């Protein structure tokens, strides 16, 4: 965000008088922020230093994530750039087949059977 330009600003409106909401249909599940790999550990340290309850470092195979909730309960994610989706398939054919991270491979049949076609 520091470089400016399109999609480079985040504006936060603080309105403490609003009621806390309950998650439901049509609501926001989570908001993800991308960070360079070199900054990932600093974000983890900063959350911990500030006393923000968080998931700790989570390996998502294609990237690493940190999760924490803002005061109204929306889940925020800070995700690293790498290693990236091309770690296990050629970039030219990304998205042409169903690729699962190794820790989910044993559940492939169940996952694939629950997928709904996109019209």
Outline where the language-model segments fall.
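Glyoxalase I/VOC metalloenzyme domain signal
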Residues: 1-54, 69-119
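Short acidic/glycine-enriched loop/turn segments that link adjacent beta-strands
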Residues: 60-64
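Conserved S-adenosyl-L-methionine
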Residues: 55-59
